[in-house]
Amino acid sequence: MTTGPLPRRVALISVHTSPLAQPGTGDAGGMNVYVWQTATRLARRGVEVEIFTRATSSSDAPRVAAAPRVTVRNVVAGPFEGLDKRDLPAQLCAFTAGVLRAEAAQEPGYYDLIHSHYWLSGQVGWLARDRWGVPLVHTAHTLAAVKNASLAAGDTAEPQLRVIGEQQVVDEADRLIANTETEASELISMYGADPARIDVVTPGADLDCYTPGPREMARTSLGLDQNEAIVTFVGRIQPLKAPDLLIEAAAPLIRRSRTSRRPVRVLIVGGPSGSGLDRPTALIDLAHDLGIADAVTFLPPQAPARLADVYRASNLVAVPSHSESFGLVAIEAQACGTPVLAADVGGLSVAVAGGRTGVLVGSHAVGDWTNALEKALAQPDRLAEMGRNARVHAEQFSWDHTVDAMLSSYSRAMQSFAARNPDAAQSVAAQNVTGSSSRTRRPWRRRRSTLLPMTGRS
């Protein structure tokens, strides 16, 4: 339980994607879910949350009361449509100006803490932290150096601009939140992060939405055959997530099972994103070329309640990603009692209990995935046992647990920041005793600026 100072109001920064967007297409994915779920649960603990995100439509209201104590501020920065995420660094000045102007319209000391999500937001948070005189907590969600070390075929490497930008944020943030111990180790080994400033805060799932249920009812609601063995991919369609690997690996099984009592079907749920936008029909073309187009079903991104039915309808959910800082899909599927076949990369080894709630595959070779799929589907009793274990495993990963750990990180950030800034220490003490929001604006300052060469870093 957190015993130190806690913020009254937090500015969450999510530049490139809104928590109100539908996950599974464009730039909306697990981070959207993370920001929304943690924001609403922080609000339930009495913390006011304001989320700054870039407006993507002229109809976006400047302020949206999204939930009790949760406000989304849509900041105009660049054109509403047609702006690729790779072009967003050029709009960070405009976005930062919008954030600073919003705060300037309030009384001094309006926000107690900034929590930035993804490196673009970290750049904004770094400047706002120095302007407002409050601590900055940063969650990377993904790291360029990690992604570039495990690129999928046909994927585009993250630019050096991002690597440098991430390095700056890692150096500047008061605390860094990593999804897993693996990500914490990557921050230390690849970015030279101070281990003492890292908190491991594991993401969760909405355990009230994602629950086990009758497979027959779920399949009926989705119009799926009751007799098929269904293997499902959920996520953005891009090389990093490797849905093509699943289709290629399943192809031999689909061909061999056509005349059996239990034919195999692949279900792809999501929309194109990132470099996947360059070839939006690539997966459809692949299924056609492999002669299995009739056994591959495509669905658009689904709302949570509908997505829960997708998980329940599946015999197995596949997460073949080349890189994954955690893997929310894996936890959501297991919460619904569905076992997971996942690549043994990043946080997936935490999200999936290999051999107990699913299977971890140690390579991205098509043959290895075909063998893993065949072995899993050939043992329905074993899959059923894994499904029962999966729900128990998933119950360790609630968003309430996530927010408990997040608030502890916030408290440490506020304490360490106050220790370095005597005026901040007095402000925190006054806040805890009186609940007063009266604080004088502190002058612009830089805590450190240590951009190091990207080679030869110790």
Swiss-Prot record:
The keyword Nucleus does not apply. Mg(2+) binds at residues 311-312, 314, 338. It catalyses: 1D-myo-inositol 3-phosphate + UDP-N-acetyl-alpha-D-glucosamine = 1D-myo-inositol 2-acetamido-2-deoxy-alpha-D-glucopyranoside 3-phosphate + UDP + H(+). UDP-N-acetyl-alpha-D-glucosamine binds at residues 22-23, 30, 236, 241, 302, 324, 332. Keywords: Glycosyltransferase, Magnesium, Metal-binding, Transferase. Residues 439-449 have a biased composition (Basic residues). GO terms for biological process: mycothiol biosynthetic process. Its EC number is 2.4.1.250. CDD domains: GT4_sucrose_synthase. Homodimer. Belongs to the glycosyltransferase group 1 family. MshA subfamily. This is D-inositol 3-phosphate glycosyltransferase. It comes from Gordonia bronchialis (strain ATCC 25592 / DSM 43247 / BCRC 13721 / JCM 3198 / KCTC 3076 / NBRC 16047 / NCTC 10667). The lineage of its organism: Bacteria, Bacillati, Actinomycetota, Actinomycetes, Mycobacteriales.
